[in-house]
Amino acid sequence: MELSWGRAFWRNFLGQSPDWYKLALIAFLIANPLIFFINPFVAGWLLVAEFIFTLAMALKCYPLLPGGLLAIEAVIIGMTSAAHVREEVAANLEVLLLLMFMVAGIYFMKQLLLFIFTRLLLSIRSKMLLSLAFCMAAAFLSAFLDALTVVAVVISVAVGFYGIYHRVASARGEENDLQDDDHLDQNSKAVLEQFRGFLRSLMMHAGVGTALGGVMTMVGEPQNLIIAKAAGWHFGDFFLRMSPVTVPVLICGLFTCVLVEKLRWFGYGETLPEKVRHILQEFDDQSRQRRTRQDKLNLFVQAIIGVWLVTALALHLAEVGLIGLSVIILATSLTGVTDEHAIGKAFTESLPFTALLTVFFSIVAVIIDQHLFAPIIQFVLQASEHAQLTLFYLFNGLLSSISDNVFVGTIYINEAKAAMESGAISMKQYELLAVAINTGTNLPSVATPNGQAAFLFLLTSALAPLIRLSYGRMVWMALPYTLVLTLVGLLCVEFTLTPITEWMTQSGWLATFS
């Protein structure tokens, strides 16, 4: 029997999302205009809460859809204007270019990144050293590349290795279904469980590594670029200004990596089974024998492009997005990727998030027009200058752990800049607040997959169900890192940020505050 028109529409509306989620969104869309005409301030805060809800429920429905509907309605009923949204998008064009071109550019360097992580996995036998190597490699790469791409590469390595062992263990060849363990004997199942635990811990170490490295540079995370632009910092300035907080946090984060592996806490400590290592080593040996001169040349070319990328970013030779575009052009030209469809695949990872970021800017426009954060900012600015840094760090951290850190970082840096321009705070204090906002946005956000886009990407990937990585397990495994990164970051903002920044300024490392 064919569906009625009403039932067909209900099924189409937000697709596979649960009915309660659809009803909640409809309730939001009905309530917002009514409340707005009674009290615009309350309606504005309600919209922000609803938008954070859509981000927190990202596994139920990609936030672009419900968030986009809320943003469109906000413009229609007059919470903000289309012209203001355009201004916000124009002001953040560099971030959109970063997401469009840099992420796509790194896609064409995946072969090199896969090679690096494969060599790490098979050449280091100590699990503790391997975990440290994965965490450090992810941190270094994320300081220059997009964290999503780094995690995507590690996922590719893990899925590939999982598939190799699963195929051999099930003896089903190419017809093997990775989700089906029924064809494995008891011994193979036990080995597979250990292998899953091993991969889970490596993925979490790599994920946290992207946060440790990503906070240090202006290209590590999208919100970093927004904050750097608002403060007028280039690559070197940003790194030096963040270093009083980020360097101690990096050291303590790496120490935490070693500690949880050694003590086997929070689900860490599983080693690579020898049976699996033998199978993977055999496969890698065969792959190396099949590698042609063309393949080797591609790896060399990608390494040279990597050097260009780091140099161009460090010397600020062009806007970040344009450097990413140059990577696309060089990588495709020199490795023979000429088909339009092959090039188009590089953009599939970044464009949904780029569209979502544009919706973020619509909500930011509402926040500005309705003066939603004015009471919070006034409360913070009434505190002493020293206490302001701690409060900004904590407020950012709290919101970033449940919401997207790009959204949170954008809101707070805009408010801090407005306070500076109005004369409420000095330029010196504003630049210190920018550091507190950036570190507060990046570090505590490892608490949940909602805060870190790389974690959410891992949770929604094809790998997560294979290695039994659920939302709850991810939060539990991230807990030691959450505590260490948040507390060390807070202590550094409290005690080391101001004196070290002043020392670097007096030493001539930083430009004198204007």
From Swiss-Prot:
GO cellular component, one term: plasma membrane
Keyword Membrane in record: yes
Membrane-related topology note: Multi-pass membrane protein
Superkingdom: Bacteria
InterPro entries linked to this entry: Na+/H+_antiporter_NhaB
Catalysed reaction, written as an equation: 2 Na(+)(in) + 3 H(+)(out) = 2 Na(+)(out) + 3 H(+)(in)
Keyword entries, A-Z: Antiport, Cell inner membrane, Cell membrane, Ion transport, Membrane, Sodium, Sodium transport, Transmembrane, Transmembrane helix, Transport
Transmembrane segments: 23-43, 63-83, 97-117, 120-140, 144-164, 202-222, 238-258, 303-323, 357-377, 391-411, 447-467, 475-495
Principal location listed in the UniProt entry: membrane
GO MF assignments: sodium:proton antiporter activity
Pfam families named among the record's database cross-references: NhaB
Localization of this protein: Cell inner membrane
Protein family according to the UniProt entry: Belongs to the NhaB Na(+)/H(+) (TC 2.A.34) antiporter family.
Job of this protein: Na(+)/H(+) antiporter that extrudes sodium in exchange for external protons.
PANTHER family per UniProt: NA(+)_H(+) ANTIPORTER NHAB (PTHR43302:SF1), TRANSPORTER ARSB-RELATED (PTHR43302)
Annotated NCBIfam families: NhaB, PRK09547.1
Protein name as it appears in the record: Na(+)/H(+) antiporter NhaB
